Regions:
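Surface-exposed, short loops/turns at beta-strand junctions within beta-sandwich domains
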Residues: 181-187
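Structural beta-strand segments of beta-rich domains
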Residues: 121-125, 176
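Acidic surface patches and DE-rich sequence motifs
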Residues: 80, 170, 198
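Acidic, Ser/Thr/Gly/Pro-rich low-complexity segments and short DxT(G/T)-type signature motifs
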Residues: 106-115, 132, 156, 184, ...
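Blade-terminus and WD-like Trp-Asp/Gly-His loop motifs, strongest in beta-propeller folds
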Residues: 117, 168-172
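Surface-exposed loop and edge beta-strand positions of immunoglobulin-like domains
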Residues: 38, 179-181
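Beta-propeller domains with acidic blade repeats across secreted/periplasmic ectodomains
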Residues: 1-110, 122, 133
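Short, surface-exposed alpha-helix to beta-strand junction/turn motifs within ectodomains of secreted
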Residues: 125-166, 191-198, 207-211
Length: 231
C-alpha cells in the first residue's frame, strides 16, 4: 500500500513524530479537524491536508509552525480543554531536545493554505483569507517520486518542473483553481508559493506544500515508474 501522504526528507521533515487531530472546535484557530505532526530534528510542527479522491485518502503536508520559540524534539502532543496545545520534547539519545511547551492561539487568523483538493486537471487551493491579485509565477510546481521498495530510503527521482497552464481566482478571493501541464499518479507535487499575500497585505505564513498524488479523480492510480526494474 502506498503512503497516503509523504513527508519529503530534508525539505519537510527528517523524523516525523506523533500525529494529533485538532478537536478544539476553533479554540486553537481556523484549522479545526486537521492533523498536526511533530518533527524531531527541527523546531517545526507540520499540518496535514487530507483529500479523498475516488475512494482513496491522499493529500498534502506543509509547515504549520516553524521555529517561533519552539524547541526541537517534539515527540508528544495533547490538547487541553482550553484549546491550547501541550508539546513534550525529548532527544531519545539522538536528535532533539528537552522540554514542555504550551501553544495557544492569538485569536488572529493567519494567512495560510487551508485546503488543497485535486481536480481533473490540477488543484483547487483555498486560503484562510482573500488573496491579492495572483499570477502563474506565484505558484511554482515541481514533481518527483521515491522508490517504492523494501530497502531503507530513496533519493528523489524524476524531478522536473510542472508548468501552470491556467488559473482562476474565485469570486470571494479565497480559492484559486490551477491547471497543470502534467498530472500523473505516483508523484509528490511540490508547490512553492512566491510573493503570495492576502488582500489585507498579510504575507502567507508558510510557502512550502507537498501533495502526494496516488490516484486521479477518474480513479486511475497507474504508476509504472514506481515498479522495481522499470526505467
Amino acid at each position: 500500500t502506498r503512503a497516503a501522504i509523504l513527508f519529503p526528507q530534508g525539505s519537510m521533515a527528517n523524523s516525523p513524530t506523533q500525529p494529533v487531530t485538532d478537536t478544539t472546535r476553533g479554540k486553537f484557530g481556523p484549522f479545526d479537524g486537521q492533523m498536526l505532526v511533530g518533527e524531531m530534528n527541527r523546531a517545526r510542527i507540520m499540518r496535514v491536508l487530507v483529500d479523498e479522491v475516488a475512494g482513496e485518502t491522499q493529500g498534502a503536508c506543509l509547515p504549520f509552525i516553524d521555529n517561533g520559540g519552539l524547541h526541537r524534539g517534539m515527540h508528544r502532543f495533547v490538547f487541553a480543554p482550553d484549546g491550547s496545545l501541550w508539546v513534550g520534547q525529548t532527544h531519545l539519545s539522538w536528535a532533539g531536545g528537552n522540554g514542555l511547551q504550551r501553544i495557544t492561539w492569538t485569536g488572529k487568523t493567519p494567512m495560510s493554505l487551508s485546503r488543497m483538493k485535486l481536480t481533473r486537471i490540477g488543484f483547487l487551493l483555498t486560503f484562510t483569507k482573500p488573496l491579492a491579485k495572483v499570477a502563474a509565477e506565484n505558484f511554482i510546481f515541481q514533481r518527483y517520486y521515491y522508490k517504492y521498495h523494501q530497502g531503507y530510503g530513496s533519493p528523489q527521482l524524476g524531478r522536473e518542473p510542472v508548468m501552470v497552464t491556467a488559473l482562476k481566482l474565485s469570486d470571494n478571493g479565497k480559492s484559486v483553481s490551477i491547471d497543470l501541464a502534467k498530472l500523473n499518479p505516483g508523484y509528490v507535487y511540490q508547490l512553492d508559493l512566491k510573493n503570495i499575500t492576502a488582500a489585507d497585505k498579510t504575507p502567507v505564513l508558510n510557502t512550502l506544500i507537498c501533495y502526494t498524488l496516488n490516484r486521479l479523480t477518474n480513479g486511475n492510480n497507474t504508476a509504472p515508474h514506481l515498479i522495481a526494474g522499470s526505467p
